[in-house]
């Protein structure tokens, strides 16, 4: 009897290990990625999407479409692969005379040289689909600079492709100018415009300790298409306790100085 119980115990352990291995093998067949879809003037989707291994960016978009009722897509098949034409009624080639506007994408901050139907995703990839006209109207990809945030200054640069006198393409770090900054503080937001050099001066009263959401927007005058890639809805910067105290005293000093100006 003891031998039978011992054999049954060993068998149960083996079965449990086998089932655990099967579950792990099943989970390994799935990958989870982050997907953000930026329309013309707002974010249309932002969240994690789980798809089977060896899936493409297009598969990720299809999965998001199936899971999210507010998201609709139109995909057209061609000799060059499947092409994403329309997301939520924003149809490629309808906003500019030259019809160069359309949907583009980046993975981990890099624009792949293949279409969405050819790029194979990996776990933890960060995918951003966005609408614009990068080749004609232009598009910048802002990198935030907070080195002088304690002084109330914030600015953005972008690594842009420019052309020299011989029309050779070169990359160059350029200042982002002419945008509108939306700064979050204490559950509220304030819009701030930069100077001609692209530097925003944030009043000290908005430099409270803790996290502050940051959004940047800029649109072409003729087409209203975005010319900067917006940040994710939850993008933020944090002001430390020390910097918050410094900003508070600078605000007091500024107020006293203005009384004697």
Regions found by a protein language model. Give the residues of each.
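N-terminal secretory signal peptides that target proteins for export/translocation
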Residues: 1-3
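Sec-dependent N-terminal signal peptides
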Residues: 5-17
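Ubiquitin-like/PB1-type beta-grasp interaction modules and other compact soluble beta-rich domains
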Residues: 7, 19-261
């Amino acid at each position: 009897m003891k031998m039978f119980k011992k054999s049954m115990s060993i068998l149960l352990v083996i079965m449990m290990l086998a089932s655990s291995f099967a579950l792990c093998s099943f989970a390994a067949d799935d990958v989870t990625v982050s997907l953000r879809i930026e329309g013309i003037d707002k974010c249309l989707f932002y969240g994690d999407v789980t798809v089977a291994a060896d899936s493409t960016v297009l598969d990720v978009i299809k999965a998001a479409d199936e899971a999210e009722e507010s998201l609709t897509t139109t995909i057209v098949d061609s000799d060059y692969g499947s092409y994403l034409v329309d997301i939520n009624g924003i149809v490629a080639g309808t906003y500019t005379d030259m019809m160069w506007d359309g949907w583009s994408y980046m993975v981990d901050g890099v624009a792949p040289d293949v279409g969405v139907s050819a790029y194979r995703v990996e776990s933890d990839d960060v995918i951003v689909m966005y609408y614009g006209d990068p080749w004609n109207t232009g598009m910048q990809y802002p990198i935030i600079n907070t080195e002088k945030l304690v002084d109330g200054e914030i600015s953005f640069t972008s690594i842009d492709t420019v052309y020299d006198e011989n029309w050779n393409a070169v990359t160059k770090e350029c200042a982002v100018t002419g945008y509108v900054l939306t700064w979050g503080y204490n559950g509220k937001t304030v819009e701030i415009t930069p100077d001609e050099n692209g530097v925003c001066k944030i009043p000290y009263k908005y430099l409270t300790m803790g996290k502050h959401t940051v959004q940047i927007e800029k649109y072409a005058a003729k087409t209203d298409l975005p010319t900067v890639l917006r940040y994710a809805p939850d993008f933020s910067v944090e002001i430390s306790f020390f910097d918050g105290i410094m900003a508070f005293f600078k605000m007091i000093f500024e107020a006293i100085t203005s009384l004697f100006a």
